Regions:
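Alpha-helical transmembrane bundle of multi-pass membrane proteins
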Residues: 1-66, 91-364
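Cytosol/matrix-facing amphipathic helices and coiled-coil assembly/linker segments
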Residues: 79-92
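Short intracellular "coupling" helices and adjacent cytoplasmic loop segments at the cytosolic face
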Residues: 68-82
Length: 364
């Protein structure tokens, strides 16, 4: 939600005019105000019923569930039935995931799903996110004074919060995940290229160019949180197979961290006047990388909106193109019946052949 980042930038901005040791001591010291309310909140928070069920503590799970549930006489809520469902679901999950290994993530159709999940997360950094993480320093190098640079940074983190809620709303009204992700990347690419071209503005108009750059950073932040920054988590949860979901998510997050480290090392060199000193021209680099992400998303990332997990499994098994996921019709029940009938026929075929041959021998 970026609330912590917004508060942090606001505190640092208020310290800009101080030139004593408290300019850095106060921001550090204010961090000591958070442990106490967090500790109190942790003590008051109820335990997860699912966690208790997985450890066989069903009675404690029922108490936690009742504490978390608003009891309404008009509803048919039954705590015992809910706990029974949790116990059954936990047993099924344990049965399904038994014997699964990380190597299974790279076998058969699961290899494609693992690749997509990993790339969806990596694209969060490759689309220019690490560039925006240095927005204050970048804007100062672009020509803004420190106060205005921090003001734009506050606007950026504030608009990030708006973008998260906006993404939730757009997905709620029915806009597809692939659609949001793909068109969001297109918007990010345009914003990055615009920032790159602003570096070509003559030095006489540097002040106007720096203000325009700050404005583009805010628009970039809005596009990012409306799409890639928020939708990626939905895609990761829906596109990974149930049996290997935890392992697939771990692999995806590991790649995200590796890419984040690489981008975090490169970006300061791009912006530092004593190093590569690219300034606004770094927008061309990240814009080019973002364009490659658009190409990948167009050809590889499917649309999971409105699909059950069983339907997604069938679509991946049939190797349906990512661009045709939304329009392909599948019937899970027909598929299951036809497949099981065919397998049953195949298994009985030798016996039928032997019986027919024996009948021929008898009649002859």
């Amino acid at each position: 939600m970026h609330i912590g980042q917004l508060i942090g930038v606001g505190v640092i901005k208020s310290m800009i005019n101080r030139d004593d040791q408290w300019a850095y001591r106060i921001p550090y010291g204010l961090q000591w105000m958070w442990p106490l309310p967090l500790f109190i909140g942790i003590l008051m928070a109820p335990e997860s019923p699912w966690w208790l069920v997985r450890r066989g503590r069903t009675e404690d799970a029922k108490k936690a569930l009742l504490r978390l549930t608003s009891v309404n006489r008009d509803t048919d809520f039954d705590a015992d039935e809910t706990i029974a469902m949790m116990v059954h679901t936990t047993a099924l999950e344990k049965q399904i995931t038994t014997g699964a290994s990380y190597w299974d993530c790279f076998k058969g159709t699961d290899r494609r799903r693992t690749e997509i999940v990993c790339m969806v997360w990596a694209i969060q950094n490759l689309s220019g996110n690490s560039f925006s993480n240095y927005s204050t320093y970048f804007l100062e190098q672009a020509g803004l004074d420190a106060s205005k640079a921090y003001a734009f940074a506050m606007g950026q983190y504030g608009i990030n919060m708006v973008g998260v809620f906006g993404a939730w709303f757009l997905m709620t009204v029915g806009l597809g995940r692939r659609t949001l992700y793909l068109y969001g990347l297109c918007g990010l690419c345009v914003m990055l290229l615009v920032m790159g071209f602003l570096g070509l503005v003559p030095h006489a108009h540097r002040d106007q160019a720096s203000l325009a750059t700050g404005s583009m950073m805010i628009v970039w932040a809005l596009f990012y949180q409306l799409s890639v920054g928020t939708v990626a988590y939905s895609l990761v949860a829906e596109l990974s197979t149930r049996r290997l979901q935890i392992k697939t998510v771990v692999l995806g997050r590991c790649l995200y961290n590796v890419v984040a480290i690489i981008c975090g090392v490169l970006t300061p060199y791009m912006l530092n006047p004593g190093a590569w000193n690219w300034g606004n021209y770094a927008g061309f680099f990240w814009g080019g990388i973002c364009f490659l992400c658009i190409v990948y998303t167009f050809f590889r990332v499917p649309e999971p909106k409105g699909r059950t997990f069983a339907e997604l499994d069938l679509l991946f098994e049939r190797k349906v193109s990512a661009r045709k996921f939304a329009d392909t019709q599948v019937d899970v029940f027909d598929e299951t019946i036809e497949s099981s009938a065919f397998q049953q026929y195949q298994s009985q075929k030798p016996a039928v052949m032997d019986a027919s041959q024996s009948e021929k021998v008898q009649y002859s």
